[in-house]
Curated annotation (Swiss-Prot):
The keyword ATP-binding applies. The gene is glpK2. Its EC number is 2.7.1.30. This is Glycerol kinase 2. Glycerol binds at residues 86-87, 138, 248-249. ADP binds at residues 16, 20, 270, 314, 415, 419. Keywords: ATP-binding, Glycerol metabolism, Kinase, Nucleotide-binding, Transferase. GO terms for biological process: glycerol catabolic process; glycerol metabolic process; glycerol-3-phosphate metabolic process. Key enzyme in the regulation of glycerol uptake and metabolism. Catalyzes the phosphorylation of glycerol to yield sn-glycerol 3-phosphate.
Amino acid sequence: MPDNAQKYVAAIDQGTTSSRCIIFDHGGAIVAVDQREHRQIFPKPGWVEHDATEIWSKVQAVVAGAIAKAGLRADQLSALGITNQRETTVLWDRATGKPVHNAIVWQDTRTSALCHELGGSDGQDRFREQTGLPLASYFSGPKAAWLLDNVPGLRARAERGEIAFGTIDSWLIWNLTGGTDGGRHVTDVTNAGRTMLMNLETLQWDRSILSAMNVPEAVLPEIRSSSEVYGTAVGQLSGVPVASALGDQQAAVFGQACYDVGTAKNTYGTGSFLLLNTGNRPVPSKNGLLTTMGYKIGGEAPVYCLEGSIAITGALVQWFRDQLGIIRTADEIETLAASVDDNGGAYIVPAFSGLFAPYWRSDARGVVTGLTRYVTKAHLARAVLEATSWQTREVVDAMYQDSGVRITTLKVDGGMTKNNLLMQHQADVLGVPVIRPRVSETTCLGAAYAAGLATGVWNDLDELKSHWQKDVEWTPSMEASERDREYHNWRKAVEKSFGWHEEDGVN
């Protein structure tokens, strides 16, 4: 039974494939979890959409499910936090509360031609100084512009103030706090920073970019901090303060207690996202990284990060399993790889659809190099795992070149952190300890922490740091000479992946 004196915080994690609600206690331990998937809609090649109404319905269901599993009443929740898939874009009718079109998902590439046109002679760098981002189809601003130009009559309605724009956090907060009956139309700095419409210095919408993209200011939410009470929930959560919003990767930074300059976390999923806390000033990147918001606590100074995104890490293990059939389950790769001492001279560069950070080479394609008759499937299994470690090393090196900050440890989360061989190799190639926390749900935990800070459940960042607990630590054991030799070979393999795909027109 729940402790009546205990304080509980709920967090909604609205992700690309599913929505979850996790309830945490005051110690940061998980009390209950509920999760539901939603549909992926693919109207055309390269197009990916979600039904925002379905997402809201699933979010309501997982909140109810988590509360029921915890044996709690809604009035026992001290706060509600939100974390979300970043960049996914919703436009809705303020009067009816209904979306005017399916949400355009971050993976969707329909705005590639529009981005190419917007870039003009400056190319991808046109808005980088103001936003920290390259002009690319991932980000929300071009998605909103596309909707305004392609849904009949929408632009005129938007200019009259009838339409609301938001990333998923805004859509959820608006609905949670009343929707058409007084719902709050807000976003936080981490999500606004991924629209390519917010100025990183002022933390306000940049009117010159709005003008260039032809997005009317009337549709935009108010930009707020990541940790403050935006409003009070109605409905099943009636009276609960809605008190945080963070993009998913920034929420993981917060949940991993990366509050000091130089602290970093890497989330290992289908791909990987490595974020480094660079403090209260944005650090521009000359090495293929994104300059992004980390978080902002109430009226305190904002914290910025450098972000390196790696397209293929866990997905390479899936390919090894599903396309090659060498293993039957993802977990088998560790046993197979551990049966040999090294990669036998083989390297696999998983540039299946190009390389992300730090190269951003859309012409790259996957290669296997260094093959001899000595190489076995076990060596290839090891090369699959090592590809993740080496790609992470390249991002860490780029972060040092941009910021001058050397990481001293790397905090890790995500499914691949269960693989001890991979985590040991990661520590070896970075030359620093790699640490996995006891609570693995760092994204939800970060949203809960930020909401609890805003409502007095926790007092300050020092208290949150004291809750963070280590589960496993891997320390480097590789000689520097071996590390340097292997890294040199990896870099040679990467060069072999360039120039394979010749594009017709705009990618």
